[in-house]
């Protein structure tokens, strides 16, 4: 296997990975495939969603602008990336099933300190209010974004809706209005 992988270019390996992913997850709702053990998980991801074997609860899900950008060949292009599209497709599948709504976010804050951008999981420091644990430089805008995100996630955990009482800035993602909340510092 090692020799085979070393004889191929990264682009070839990535292309083959995407082909295989398309085979095991044809709807491309989300890019992670569970391990079906026939005990805890008795069916695949697509079957669970399309047959309504998932909980009827509100969902909040999203991606970052530079998700999964380990190598230039693998770097997703923002809204064109598979994770971004998968979040929208998941929301639309819930709507088709008549389920509670999904709220989708797109974290675009390019973190300061290097050129990694808004990399996978970079939103977590903001969401959990742990910016001070990061070595990266921050601005007042970063702390304001963190407070906004903590409020949104707290509201969602309490009510199933990220909006504070009396507000409706963050809309559910639906077929008629595929809304995605962009999270970044205010300029």
Segments and roles (model prediction):
Residues 7, 34, 58:
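Short glycine- and Lys/Arg-enriched binding-loop motifs that mark or flank ligand-binding interfaces
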């Amino acid at each position: 296997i090692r020799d085979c992988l070393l004889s191929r270019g990264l682009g070839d390996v990535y292309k083959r990975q995407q082909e295989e992913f398309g085979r095991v997850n044809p709807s491309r709702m989300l890019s992670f495939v569970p391990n079906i053990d026939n005990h805890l998980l008795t069916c695949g991801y697509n079957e669970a969603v399309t047959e309504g074997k998932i909980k009827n609860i509100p969902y909040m899900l999203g991606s970052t602008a530079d998700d999964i950008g380990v190598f230039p060949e693998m770097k997703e292009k923002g809204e064109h990336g598979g994770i971004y599209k998968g979040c929208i497709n998941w929301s639309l599948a819930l709507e088709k099933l008549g389920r509670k709504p999904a709220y989708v976010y797109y974290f675009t804050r390019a973190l300061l300190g290097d050129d990694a951008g808004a990399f996978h999981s970079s939103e977590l420091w903001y969401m959990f209010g742990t910016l001070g644990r990061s070595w990266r430089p921050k601005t007042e805008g970063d702390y304001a974004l963190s407070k906004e995100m903590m409020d949104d996630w707290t509201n969602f955990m309490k009510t199933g809706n990220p909006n504070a009482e009396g507000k409706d800035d963050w809309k559910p993602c639906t077929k008629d209005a595929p809304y995605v909340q962009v999270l970044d510092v205010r300029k």
